UniProtKB/Swiss-Prot annotation:
The gene is F9. Coiled coil: none annotated. GO terms for biological process: blood coagulation; proteolysis; zymogen activation. This is Coagulation factor IX. Transmembrane segments: none annotated. It comes from Cavia porcellus (Guinea pig). Belongs to the peptidase S1 family. The lineage of its organism: Eukaryota, Metazoa, Chordata, Craniata, Vertebrata.
Amino acid sequence: RVSIPSVSKEHNRANAIFSRMGYVNFTDDETIWDDNDDDETIWDNSTESTKPSDEFFRVVGGEDAKPGQFPWQVLLNGETEAFCGGSIVNEKWIVTAAHCILPGIKIEVVAGKHNIEKKEDTEQRRNVTQIILHHSYNASFNKYSHDIALLELDKPLSLNSYVTPICIANREYTNIFLKFGAGYVSGWGKLFSQGRTASILQYLRVPLVDRATCLRSTKFTIYNNMFCAGFHEGGRDSCQGDSGGPHVTEVEGTNFLTGIISWGEECAMKGKYGIYTKVSRYVNW
């Protein structure tokens, strides 16, 4: 269950938005996953079941975020280094990409982070006690299909202006919000393909790409649980190390989770796009 923290004005605004749209509450279903979402349908005329190679972890051309600008963003640390991003669902749970989770890995979640090269008063560190991969996720079949996972923290986060859950709408409205056309992605991933990672949290506004254009851009399979976003001319994109981080859509001043950074071919290449997990498929959570 996703609680509505009293400290978060964003969630109150979200309920007001839904009221105007004829929908009063959001994300109050007790189930972890939507059992009706096993659709492996391939977009349009794509027929290959080719898998991207392991190097495609999937913010190039982005801007430095201000402290607290993306308070739902978290950093995932392994035993030796940071490796992925994620989003705060509530005080005890984080959502990220399933492909970030390697067998036996010990994960530390860092919330309230801005500059990863400095110890900051705003940061909160928690260990992960439980990992839940989507029940249809099968890395041996396709590492990026149903690319979504939940992480349970060992103790609750203390919510404040630097550590705040992202709003999650119901399936219908999450899909509608995605189609608004552009969303924000953020992370500490590589600043250019094969380059160095960012010290300060980066963000970028990326346009949604229609299915036909996306299919023409790649030889790899694009399922209905994925969507494409980015720029045809290249130069701006999510990149290695950003995986698991949020794609959010702003609606009347409130930010909603609409995607999860998943994969791509290199980073910011002309004619190539970032591929994201479509959150609307998984919100009965």
